[in-house]
């Protein structure tokens, strides 16, 4: 079994860069309602450890993540990896070996910078109070090749340093992820 998995899973230490593209992303901004945005950018993960439960897998650390969108209302909206070490490691779990099938669960902490916030002033920086969870439970290959990940629940966004003052919510984030070696 381990020999079969050996070819399926990336080795510890490997860094995997991917492009990200998410269209028609609904961002609820309290005073404006829902703004629809198209994000593009990238994410990079590093394989940190093996998972021994079930059929096995690996734990992944997000080491770079940034996507941005242009909005006529909000200007440039940028989602960037937050500079914190408390984000859980992401998971790549083997669901079956013949044929290969995987579930990837991505845990993300980030800031959202809105260039032209409603009400004026300089850029507004928001952060998520709890990690965003993106899942694809139907991967047939890893790294992903044009695979779509879905946000598991809406993400509340509040000003950095004021996590209870929610002013926006990321409602969905259907993101297509493609390995970009």
Residues covered by each model-derived region:
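Extracytosolic secretory-pathway proteins
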Residues: 1-181
């Amino acid at each position: 079994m381990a020999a079969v998995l050996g070819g399926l899973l990336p080795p510890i230490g490997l860094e995997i860069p991917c492009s990200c593209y998410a269209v028609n992303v609904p961002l609820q901004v309290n005073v404006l309602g829902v703004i629809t945005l198209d994000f593009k950018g990238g994410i990079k993960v590093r394989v940190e450890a093996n998972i021994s439960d079930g059929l096995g897998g690996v734990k992944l650390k997000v080491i770079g993540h940034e996507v941005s969108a242009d909005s006529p209302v909000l200007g440039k909206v940028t989602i960037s990896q937050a500079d914190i070490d408390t984000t859980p490691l992401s998971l790549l779990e083997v669901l079956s070996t013949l044929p290969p099938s995987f579930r990837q669960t991505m845990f993300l902490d980030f800031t959202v910078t809105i260039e032209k916030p409603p009400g004026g002033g300089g850029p507004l920086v928001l952060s998520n109070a709890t990690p965003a969870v993106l899942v694809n439970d139907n991967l047939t290959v890893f790294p992903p090749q044009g695979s779509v990940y879905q946000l598991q629940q809406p993400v509340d966004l509040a000003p950095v340093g004021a996590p209870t003052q929610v002013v926006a919510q990321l409602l969905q984030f259907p993101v297509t992820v493609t390995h970009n070696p």
